[in-house]
């Protein structure tokens, strides 16, 4: 089998990035054909462009226009991006709540969504979307739940739902856009075609440990209770493994075709 070059972006604020980075590296290392380079943001555009696939776990990372164009062109050129949890989040803390500014349209249109809010962390149920029940990414996955951040987002372009939950109501005063009155599916996992390539987005994966809230403006010296998120669920790891396999498919298909 061919060598497969992955670029892993793990960085940002208010999450246990070290934990997520380690867990994702362990999963990537299960395949001896995969070689990984790691960054905290999108600044190493040369390494990103040279990779076979991209995987990310970030929160409130703000790429430049040039960096956004590089990741857009990376996917549009036929490659795949497995984006996790807060990759689609940028935040601005103001007196009336946390705003999610629409200042990064290229990034959000490439990802297919932008995070806007989440209710308080508590368990929520997740099911495979009926139209996707035979898709290899989710086939055979039984209904499950996780105690995590239930993402409320706006969407861009073509979206292929894979997994969903439901939420209606007020997500809480912490976020400026907190009124979500429509009782409709909230996507937990979806595919988003971009040119010749595709993005797979999977929203669970919150994790917070002792020192993760020290970043301003929150500046909490020590967080009192660890928040473990979906990482405690075997189903979460099963889906991560499937997502990584999905991301490798174009490279392996090209090698097989000679």
Enumerate the language-model features and the residues they cover:
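A short, polar/proline- and glycine-enriched secondary-structure boundary/capping micro-motif
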Residues: 93, 173, 211-214
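Catalytic beta-strand/loop cores that center a nucleophilic Ser/Cys/Thr
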Residues: 29, 35-37, 49-50, 119-207
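Helical hinge/lid and interdomain linker segments adjacent to catalytic or ligand-binding clefts
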Residues: 3-93
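Short, solvent-exposed loop/turn segments at secondary-structure junctions
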Residues: 13-14, 61, 88-90, 166-169, ...
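A glycine-rich, often tryptophan-bearing local segment used as a flexible ligand/cofactor-contacting loop or short
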Residues: 62-140
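Extracellular ligand-binding/catalytic regions of CAZymes and related secreted enzymes
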Residues: 1-2, 30, 179-186, 194-258
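Oxidoreductase and adenylate-handling cofactor-binding alpha/beta cores
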Residues: 107, 111-113, 143-159, 195, ...
């Amino acid at each position: 089998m061919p060598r497969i070059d992955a670029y892993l972006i793990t960085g940002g604020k208010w999450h246990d990035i070290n934990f997520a980075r380690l867990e994702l590296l362990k999963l990537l290392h299960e395949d001896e054909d995969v070689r990984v380079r790691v960054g905290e943001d999108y600044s190493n555009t040369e390494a990103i462009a040279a990779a076979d696939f991209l995987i990310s776990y970030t929160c409130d990372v703000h790429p430049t226009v040039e960096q956004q164009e590089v990741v857009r062109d990376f996917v549009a050129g036929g490659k795949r991006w497995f984006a996790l949890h807060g990759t689609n989040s940028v935040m601005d803390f103001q007196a009336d709540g946390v705003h999610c500014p629409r200042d990064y349209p290229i990034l959000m249109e490439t990802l297919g969504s932008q995070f806007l809010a989440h209710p308080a962390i508590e368990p929520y149920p997740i099911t495979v979307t009926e139209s996707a029940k035979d898709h290899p990414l989710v086939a055979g996955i039984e209904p499950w739940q996780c105690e995590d951040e239930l993402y409320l987002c706006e969407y861009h372009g073509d979206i292929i739902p894979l997994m969903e939950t439901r939420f209606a109501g007020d997500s809480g005063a912490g976020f400026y856009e907190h009124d979500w009155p429509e009782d409709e599916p909230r996507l937990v996992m979806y595919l988003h075609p971009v040119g010749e390539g595709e993005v797979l987005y999977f929203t669970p994966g919150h994790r917070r440990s002792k020192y993760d809230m020290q970043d301003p403006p929150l500046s909490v010296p020590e967080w009192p209770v660890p928040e473990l998120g979906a990482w405690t669920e075997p189903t979460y790891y099963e889906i991560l493994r499937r997502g990584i396999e999905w991301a490798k498919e174009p490279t392996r298909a090209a090698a097989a075709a000679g």
